[in-house]
């Protein structure tokens, strides 16, 4: 008699199957690493998939230069401890133009430093498949995206031109110049992610845990004062509104565009308990999701993660 797999073990097995399938099927895959909790789980699953061997593909971070300092510290620590083959890419055109989220706004900053930066990196290294940690429960445009998300030669996504995925059968045939984005965590929920992190003891960025932090409220969003660059864009009146609150982050991105939530969750069990009670989206603090109706789908059509 075969024991039934638990819910998390079923998700784990599905994700490992997808990762192995892509590694076997594509010539030059890469795993995108955004340093967040989903990336941590995806990386853990990939290491399990090929243990005791090393990952058969590199890990890539598209760096906007505006991540939280704790994220950079954590990234470098993981690369050293796990012996990862890390590629980092910063859009040189964006750097030359001095693109930043304060002067140019969230939409332009995201387009140039994230979307265009990613497309540059994929073209530069000739990757034909890129793993991403997106989940269907995060946001409506991601809810309708396939596990194998096909992109044309310009990395654009056409949601009306996706292939059916029946059972666990994935069609990876692509024409020259085309590629796919692969989402092994598609069927996971935010709660699944946290329960798996707890059970597997996966290291994550400390920003996910509640602590006293300096924040300022901007348009209803609590923005953390992560370094001095933000102070250059605050008036004296704004600086006077900086307060210390006990907050944590449910999602991590560029720090001026990522809102914190007030919380008492200092441990993984606290976070899981909080997830069982919450009724709000984890991406409520992502400023880029509020650029306009359908903004995430528009970004993805142009090549965003």
From Swiss-Prot:
GO molecular-function term, one example from the UniProt record: ATP binding
Keywords annotated in UniProt: ATP-binding, Nucleotide-binding, Nucleotidyltransferase, Transferase
Matching InterPro entries: PAPS_reduct_dom, Rossmann-like_a/b/a_fold, SO4_adenylTrfase_ssu, Sulfate_adenylyltrnsfr_sub2
Function: With CysN forms the ATP sulfurylase (ATPS) that catalyzes the adenylation of sulfate producing adenosine 5'-phosphosulfate (APS) and diphosphate, the first enzymatic step in sulfur assimilation pathway. APS synthesis involves the formation of a high-energy phosphoric-sulfuric acid anhydride bond driven by GTP hydrolysis by CysN coupled to ATP hydrolysis by CysD.
Catalysed reactions listed for this entry: sulfate + ATP + H(+) = adenosine 5'-phosphosulfate + diphosphate
Lineage per the UniProt record: Bacteria, Pseudomonadati, Pseudomonadota, Gammaproteobacteria, Pseudomonadales
EC number(s) given by UniProt: 2.7.7.4
A Pfam match: PAPS_reduct
Xref: Gene3D superfamilies: HUPs
Family affiliation: Belongs to the PAPS reductase family. CysD subfamily.
Assembly description: Heterodimer composed of CysD, the smaller subunit, and CysN.
Catalytic EC class: transferase
GO biological process, any: sulfate assimilation
Protein name: Sulfate adenylyltransferase subunit 2
